[in-house]
């Protein structure tokens, strides 16, 4: 029984998905009250003795409350456990913004238990603020101003709370290429101006633990020097992960935790480490050594989702103080990281104090109610009832904006189990605040029935009565423990109740009693289940006109098939045994070219209903009937000697009949026969009417054809020779005329111009002088 404590508030948490009138109980293989409760949120169990009749299964006891009452089950005998919620309020004297402190839920599968959570924003709640600054060279002006901020930051916190503390940390990037220049000289002084004193690059340095000493803040921050790196994105997510993962080193208290992230550029995230050959995923653990993140070159950057989970787990609210050009980038980041804000930082960070105050007021005035990770068997939904009259229903987390100090808001939390669960707990909290609600979850799957009875008259003295059902002793089975197993196992007994080695006993519609199926009595009116394996019934047959087998007048259903009365036929007894609609004018059923089914012709392929007379796509059988036509009409052809036997199915008509098919084919002598085919009832049965006259064409004159062909060839040859001779003569004549013209043009004398004398005379000039 559920514990009864006067100091606990008991809330009924049944949240049905449908109204009572539309509730249904879908049950399958139900034999106990627990099985029934697990079947659905609307199922109830009747524990009344002898509630089930002969052949009725124990699952009859499982139904909706309304159905059980209508079947005669007394209301006191109906077992219907409900999901419940018990809450314990916060202890007096403790400042709590979230109540109640503890909730115990008893969950029935499919039914939700609901309870209210109240949040009241307190004034002056303690705050820890950690200032995380980008020390890349582009932030040189900002560092000079931040060094003077210690007193202003604490004064700003004291305006909000009586207990405020501040801390400081800085970051640059991983110290490998391509993120920083790894040249030894550049590692000593990464700044572009060599005259400027800079510190070597680093991933994250924890400078000052959270403190309320503003002088110490200014002293420690004043010692910081600017640094530098190569690429534009910085290693800020690496630093934020260490701030969240190292609570003892940072000095976080269990109060409101703010992380101010100041930068003028973007950020590296998971996967970027591969550029520097860093392949190991970020493990989300603390790796500070001497206040330095020395393992940064061993682990990749964290993903945004991983960082968001770690910040929420550590209850840290980030405030991104970024320059104007980066505001939109970090606004996208706040959509993924809950309870985070963005503020526009001036170029020299002079407005950082006002930025933090504005962001804190924005964060603290919005409340997100959420829970830690749950198994798939538990579902949680939130209804938010905010002070500004805004309501949200069935959301994955509670959400209220514009929450004012000391003005309570209410969230209704609904928890549903999808099955009978093990005892477990989970925590609900308002993100960014320290208070939590512990929820303890217990299963509500057992029925508180009357105590078990060993009444011999009910269970034959061989078992006990539990929730109206006999639980038999070893060696006995049956509804009233009437069957003795004689040492046989239940598997052996059930084997004879399975059809064709099926895994379902008695087709799922009966109980195996002493190795035989006892079929259930169906909930469906007039339905009877029968058969050796309860495989048959009288309703699962084809229907006609909305009735099984067309109704009792047409036929009855026997084990899935209709048995029709004498006047009807068909798979659903939908047809009258008549052929009137299938007879043609000659009284032949479907013209002999089909079968009559349900008084409608089912024609042979090609023929068309309603009477299978026409076959538009069938080939004309003219050529096939040409031999019979020739022998019947002209007593000649290939069938002339046995015409009556070969053409007995074809009748010769003396006069033409309209509507026949005209044919024109050659006979055995080459003459054309013209005849008309008229189809009779049946396939390939025709009458034929033949024209009296044949069209015989005289044969060709072979001698004339041959003589003409030879003569034509000879004449063509002679003509071609004459043409060739004429062309040759014309060509020779043209050449002769050209020769005559050339001869007339020549100027030759009697000497041959080509002749050269064989003697040469040479005159000596000196001979003449002498």
From Swiss-Prot:
Post-translational modification: Both Ser-746 and Ser-757 become phosphorylated when T-cells are exposed to phorbol esters. Phosphorylation on Thr-759 (but not on Ser-757) allows interaction with 14-3-3 proteins.
Motif (Cell attachment site): 397-399
Residues covered by the VWFA domain: 124-363
Record domain PSI: where: 24-74
PROSITE patterns the UniProt entry points to: EGF_1 (PS00022), EGF_2 (PS01186), I_EGF_1 (PS00243), I_EGF_2 (PS52047)
UniProt-listed SUPFAM superfamilies: EGF/Laminin, Integrin beta tail domain, Integrin domains, Plexin repeat, vWA-like
Subunit structure: Heterodimer of an alpha and a beta subunit. The ITGB2 beta subunit associates with the ITGAL, ITGAM, ITGAX or ITGAD alpha subunits. Found in a complex with CD177 and ITGAM/CD11b. Interacts with FGR. Interacts with COPS5 and RANBP9. Interacts with FLNA (via filamin repeats 4, 9, 12, 17, 19, 21, and 23). Interacts with THBD.
Domain notes: The VWFA domain (or beta I domain) contains three cation-binding sites: the ligand-associated metal ion-binding site (LIMBS or SyMBS), the metal ion-dependent adhesion site (MIDAS), and the adjacent MIDAS site (ADMIDAS). This domain is also part of the ligand-binding site.
Protein name: Integrin beta-2
């Amino acid at each position: 029984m559920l514990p009864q404590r006067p100091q606990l508030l008991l809330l009924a948490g049944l949240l049905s998905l449908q109204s009572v009138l539309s509730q249904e109980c879908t049950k399958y293989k139900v034999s106990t009250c627990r099985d029934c409760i697990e079947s659905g949120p609307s199922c109830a169990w009747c524990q009344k003795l002898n509630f089930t009749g002969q052949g009725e299964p124990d699952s009859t006891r499982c139904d909706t409350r309304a159905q059980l009452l209508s079947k005669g089950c007394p209301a006191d005998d109906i077992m219907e456990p409900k999901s419940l919620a018990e809450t314990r309020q916060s202890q007096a004297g403790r400042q709590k913004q979230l109540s109640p402190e503890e909730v115990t839920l008893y969950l029935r599968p499919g039914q939700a238990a609901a309870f209210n959570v109240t949040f009241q924003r307190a004034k002056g709640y303690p705050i820890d603020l950690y200032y995380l600054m980008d020390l890349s060279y582009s932030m040189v002006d900002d560092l000079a101003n931040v060094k003077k901020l210690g007193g202003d930051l604490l004064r700003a916190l004291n305006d909000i709370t009586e207990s405020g503390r501040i801390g400081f940390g800085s970051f640059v990037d991983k110290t490998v290429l391509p993120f920083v220049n790894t040249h030894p000289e550049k590692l000593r002084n990464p700044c572009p101006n060599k005259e400027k004193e800079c510190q070597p690059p680093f991933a994250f340095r924890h400078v000052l633990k959270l403190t309320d000493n503003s002088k110490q803040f200014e002293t420690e921050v004043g010692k910081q020097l600017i640094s530098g790196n190569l690429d534009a994105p910085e290693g800020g997510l690496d630093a934020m992960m260490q701030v969240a993962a190292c609570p003892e080193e940072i000095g976080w208290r269990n109060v409101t935790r703010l992380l101010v992230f100041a930068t003028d550029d973007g950020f590296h995230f998971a996967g970027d480490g591969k550029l520097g050959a860093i392949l190991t995923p970020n493990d989300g653990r603390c790796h500070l050594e001497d206040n330095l993140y020395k393992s940064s070159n061993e682990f990749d950057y964290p993903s945004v989702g991983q960082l968001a989970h770690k910040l929420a787990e550590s209850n840290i609210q980030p405030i991104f103080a970024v320059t104007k050009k980066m505001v939109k980038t970090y606004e996208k980041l706040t959509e993924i990281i809950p309870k985070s804000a963005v503020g526009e930082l001036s170029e020299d960070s002079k407005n950082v104090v006002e930025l933090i105050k504005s962001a804190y007021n924005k964060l603290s005035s919005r409340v997100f109610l959420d829970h830690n990770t749950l198994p798939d068997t538990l579902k949680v939904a939130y209804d938010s009832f905010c002070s500004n009259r805004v309501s949200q229903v069935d959301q994955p987390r509670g959400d209220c904006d514009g929450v004012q100090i000391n003005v309570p808001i209410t969230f209704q939390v609904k928890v549903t189990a999808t099955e009978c669960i093990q005892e477990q707990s989970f925590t609900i909290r308002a993100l960014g605040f320290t208070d939590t609600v512990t929820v303890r979850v217990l299963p509500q799957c057992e029925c508180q029935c009357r105590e078990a009875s060993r009444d011999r008259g009910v269970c034959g003295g061989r078992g006990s009565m539990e929730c109206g059902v006999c639980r038999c002793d070893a060696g006995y089975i049956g509804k009233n423990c009437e069957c003795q197993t004689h040492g046989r196992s239940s598997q052996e007994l059930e084997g004879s109740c399975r059809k064709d080695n099926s895994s379902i006993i008695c087709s799922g519609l009966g109980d195996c009693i002493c190795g035989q199926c006892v079929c259930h009595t169906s909930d469906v009116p007039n339905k009877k289940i029968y058969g050796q394996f309860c495989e048959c019934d009288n309703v699962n047959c084809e229907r006609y006109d909305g009735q099984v087998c067309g109704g009792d007048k047409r036929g009855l259903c026997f084990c899935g098939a209709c048995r029709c009365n004498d006047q009807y036929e068909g798979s659903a007894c939908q047809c009258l045994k008549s052929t009137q609609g299938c007879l043609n004018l000659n009284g032949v059923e479907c013209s002999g070219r089909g079968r009559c089914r349900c008084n409608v012709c089912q024609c042979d392929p090609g023929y068309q209903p309603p009477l299978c007379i026409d076959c538009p796509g069938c080939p004309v059988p003219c050529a096939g009937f040409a031999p019979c036509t020739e022998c019947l009409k002209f007593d000649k052809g290939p069938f002339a000697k046995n015409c009556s036997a070969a053409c007995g199915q074809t009748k010769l008509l003396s006069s033409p009949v309209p509507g026949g098919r005209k044919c024109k084919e050659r006979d055995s002598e080459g003459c054309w026969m013209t005849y008309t085919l008229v189809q009779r009832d049946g396939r390939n049965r025709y009458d034929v009417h033949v024209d009296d006259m044949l069209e015989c064409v005289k044969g060709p004159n072979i001698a004339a054809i041959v003589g003409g062909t030879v003569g034509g060839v000879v004449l063509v040859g002679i003509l071609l020779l004459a043409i060739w001779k004429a062309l040759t003569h014309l060509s020779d004549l043209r050449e002769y005329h050209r020769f005559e013209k050339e001869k007339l043009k020549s100027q030759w004398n009697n000497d041959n111009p080509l002749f050269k004398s064989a003697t040469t005379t040479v005159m000596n000039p000196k001979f003449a002088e002498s």
